[in-house]
Structure formats: C-alpha cells, structure tokens
Amino acid sequence: MCIRDRHNSVSINLNVLEEQRKRNEVTGRNYTKIFYSGSACMYPEHNQLDPDNPDCSEDSAYPANPDSEYGWEKLFSERLYFAYHRNHGIPVRVTRYHNIFGPEGTWDGGREKAPAAICRKVAQLPPVGGHIEVWGDGEQTRSFLYIDECIEASRRLMDSEFIGPVNIGSEEMVTINELTEITSRVAGKPIKRNHKM
C-alpha cells in the first residue's frame, strides 16, 4: 500500500477518536465503546521466521519491527487507540486479526488471503490438475479463521470489560504447502507446486 493510504487510515482513526473525545466532553458522558480492527501484521518480522514456532502472543509486539508499512500503520493506530483510552478515558476494544477468510472475501487481484488465492489457482486448473505458483518454500505457517468465528470473537470482546489487544485467529497453524494439499484433495485435482523464492 502507498503512503497516501497509510495517511488516510491514520487520519480516519484519529478523526474517530477525536470526535468521540469531543462528544464525551460536551455531553459529560463516556459510554460508547470504540472498536479497532488491528492485524497480526504488526508483529515483529523476527517473531515469525521460525515456521514451527512463530511468536505472535499479544505481549510479543515489542521491540517493534513489522515487515511492512501496513504493519507499522496498524501498530501506530493501535497505540493511538490506547493513548486515547489512557488520556481521555475512551473505552476501546482492540483486536489483532489473523488471516480471516470466508464468502465475499477478495479472491483475486493480489490482495486476497492465501486460502482464496490457492482456491482460485486450483479452480482455474483443468480437471486433470497442473502446476500452481506458491510464494516462498511453502513452509511458512499461518493461522486461518472463518469469518463467522471472527465475528463471534469480536462480539465477545465488545461485550467484555477487556480492552485488548486480543489475537483473533485459530490456534492451529497450517503451512502453505498443507493448504495447497487440502485444496487439491477437495477439488479432486492433482497439483504440483512451483515455489517462487
């Protein structure tokens, strides 16, 4: 994502928080919880290098070192929400989503999650199967969570007194190679992976 997108995202978050602060000041009340949809992309890159033991626990975010501008923006915005909570008493709830998937999700164009991209690649193969491209060696692990479970977890957080951050994802880790094998089996199409390093 470009810098303008990051700027827009930060501006939106700041405007939401600032408007709530002003409203609370005028009304003398502070009852509206504000939800922030964070991302596991804010975790340090070095925490995720070992595919057999990624460290994405909520307390492992620091020292900060996300691997993309998107991750840095998510981390900054999360800190912004916590600052407004501390300094202005605004009740916030903060999540860190891990690879949420389901219907109506993006499935092409380069912004799709791994399950959608792999399903699309396999679906586009002829009935006899073929080759699909996989980034990296395929041993990188991910936690995937279906959208309905994500919504339920988010709702529970909103109903609780805990502000977060809370990881919302599956405890089960799946390698990209395993995901391609599952997709191949379900589709009934044999595949060979071309690993793009």
Where are these regions (language model features)?
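Active-site Tyr-X1-5-Lys
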Residues: 17-19, 23, 65-98, 117-128
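C-terminal substrate-binding subdomain of Rossmann-fold SDR/epimerase-dehydratase oxidoreductases
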Residues: 124-197
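Flexible, glycine-rich beta-alpha linker
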Residues: 42-44, 68-69, 93-115, 140-141
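Short-chain dehydrogenase/reductase
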Residues: 6-10, 56, 62, 66-78, ...
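Structural signature of the Rossmann-like NAD(P)-dependent dehydrogenase/reductase core
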Residues: 33-38, 93-99, 133-136, 143, ...
